[in-house]
Swiss-Prot record:
It comes from Bifidobacterium longum (strain NCC 2705). The gene is rplF. One of its GO terms (molecular function) is rRNA binding. GO terms for biological process: cytoplasmic translation. It comes from the Bacteria. Part of the 50S ribosomal subunit. One of its GO terms (cellular component) is cytosolic large ribosomal subunit. This is Large ribosomal subunit protein uL6. The keyword Cell inner membrane does not apply. Belongs to the universal ribosomal protein uL6 family. The lineage of its organism: Bacteria, Bacillati, Actinomycetota, Actinomycetes, Bifidobacteriales.
Amino acid sequence: MASHIGKLPIAIPAGVEVKIEGQNFSAKGAKGSDSYVVPEGITAAVEGNEIVLTAADDLRPTRAKHGLARSIMAGMVKGVHDGYSKTLEIVGTGYRAVAKGQGIEFFLGYSHTITVNPPEGITLKVTDANHVVVEGTDKQVVGQVAANIRKLRAPEPYKGKGIKYSDERILRKAGKAGK
């Protein structure tokens, strides 16, 4: 019984260059390049315009790594071809973001401003004072940077003020009951 996810082939889109040397996998595309070390017990091969992964045995840990490796490699191929992005929305009176060099300066109701500088391979854009876009080729890093920015002022449940993902719904609570 093989991994259901692992046995699916990964389509290589036009414009993406894939290299497999032993356990090292690298992908290069229009948006950038990325590399990954394939776990032991998993072999990757390019067949035509697809990447096929095979597991050495059928043990549970190997099956888990098989699916994991396939998902990570598929994400890398998509990342170097299309890229990943997350949009954050800033809600609240006086809360805003301003581009400052490579990074962004946030005014979030604290006594000080907060400057966020992106790691390598990530770009931060301020579309307007209340919207920030995090873009990059690595899905995990894009999500982590977006989560770190959201954490600066997480949305509160009473008025919904704070930084939220653009597709996130904030669960609202009723305020205290009056007399």
